């Protein structure tokens, strides 16, 4: 078997094993608390949190003035993190180039993607958290933003994918090991939620959580 074939197979095998091994294995979803959501497009997962809950408010950090056009009743914020070139240079999958594929594989600066939304229930999965778990998740997401001297996230001069989203400077590097989806899994782990040990792909992350209720 050539090394060109062996390496992708080894990566896929490791991803499968990592998806089956839990961290925070003793976690159980509480009967009451704050519900958050996981939305995915088959390749990438976003975390969706309420704009304000239990005294934690995203609006001072991510003012709607940072965005072109946010509905007044948009009360939820979606967060993702990924490699700079992949995020900024590929608004659609048809825009992927060898350069962005190389960046995704070898790694580069991480940026944050933020989008306001009215309704989070389009998301595929839902997770209920205790107030303490929510506080830890909120802090873990906030720590992903690079901050200016005033403690504010640094907005990137980029039009975004639409009128309700924007990009911000992130912290650390993204790579084929620490992917966008692994970043999400790590936020859940830091909150104390059961998550997969290593989940570079969507399916390895989302399978552990219940489907969102679309009836509400």
Feature map (PLM): residue ranges:
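Glycine-rich catalytic cores of cysteine/serine-nucleophile enzymes that process amide/ester linkages
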Residues: 38-129
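Short, mixed-charge, low-aromatic patches
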Residues: 90-98, 135-145, 160-165
